[in-house]
Amino acid sequence: MTRQNTSESDNTQRPPIPQYDTVDDIDELTDAMDKEDHHHHHHHHEHHHQHQGIAQYDTVEEVETLETVHHRTSLNQEVPTPQRRSHPQYDNLDDIDDQEYITEVEVKSNRGSTLTTRPHVTIKQDEIEDIGERQVTVIEIASQKGSTKRVAPRKDYAPSIPLPEHPAQQSAPPTQQSRPQTTSHKPPNPEMEFDIGVKNIAPVLIHKMNMDDRDPKDSAQYLNTSFFEVFNEPSEQYHSIACVWTLSFKIFEIVRIYSYKILTLIFGLIIAFLGGILFALFAFLNIWIFRPILILTRMAFAQIVLIWPMFLIYIVRPFFYSVGAIFSTARLHTSRGEQVVEVWEKHIHHV
């Protein structure tokens, strides 16, 4: 947006004030305008209007309304010089966080200062909507010596687009053609692999046994019988000699404990071997014989249940109706008494 105020009494226009990019470069302009306004106030007090150069704005919020400007000029008040939005400044390029959306970088050197400080970096950044989807252009404007500007465009492509390899990085073509291999090793087919179950044995071999608790599921707690659960002497009348009672307790417990250990030492491994075969045989019969036969029988009975009512209605019932009709006229004759003549026998002529 551009605005320009002219004097009503003067026909000639003043020369335009030079334009600047940053706010720091407008200090000299402000001092010159103050001196010129003070000199013009003594000669043209009734028609005093402060001259403003051509100002540039970035946003609408920075622009004052025209009524406020005329009100201040009518009251001989100084209209403040519009200031441009300051851009973030950094000491070096490494301090910039969001380098993805940077469109312009300007490096300013401290020419007027005798202090040896690092140049300041001013970042000009566009909005996200103004940046392309596939690439970001970064313009570096460096002025280490003077105010000369060098534009060095650099395009950073998105990582999803593969970049072509440099000719030097490409592998050189082979000088000699390699001979084709006659033997090819095909990976083994897991469906046809002869697996004897080594993976299933591994958890058993590395299993750590709990030597203190050998009945983790409490399935044989009824075997925990002691001497006092088997032998009891209820009253003094049935008390045996003290040494007999004491030695009986010790002998019973010791013999029971060591007899079990000796029996397990002799027959434990054999019974474990036979038990493994027996349970494996039962599992084999259940998986490969009993269960298939059970499934087959259930399938057959399901078909019989559908056919049986029709068999009873259309075959069995008519058959027994016919048998009942045949034997319903049966008569029993005895040698004693009057002979019973059937109905159809009355019409038969005997020769």
Curated annotation (Swiss-Prot):
Homooligomer. It is found in: Golgi apparatus membrane; Cell membrane; Membrane, Caveola; Apical cell membrane. GO terms for biological process: caveola assembly; cell surface receptor signaling pathway; parturition; regulation of egg-laying behavior. Residues 38-51 have a biased composition (Basic residues). The gene is cav-2. This is Caveolin-2. It is a peripheral membrane protein. May act as a scaffolding protein within caveolar membranes. Interacts directly with G-protein alpha subunits and can regulate their activity. Thought to have a role in the uptake of lipids and proteins in the intestinal cells; operates in the apical uptake of lipid markers and trafficking of yolk proteins. Affects fecundity and egg laying. It comes from Caenorhabditis elegans. Its main location: Golgi. Belongs to the caveolin family. Residues 262-290 dip into the membrane without crossing it. Residues 1-261, 291-351 are cytoplasmic. One of its GO terms (molecular function) is molecular adaptor activity. Residues 22-31 have a biased composition (Acidic residues). It holds the Pfam family Caveolin.
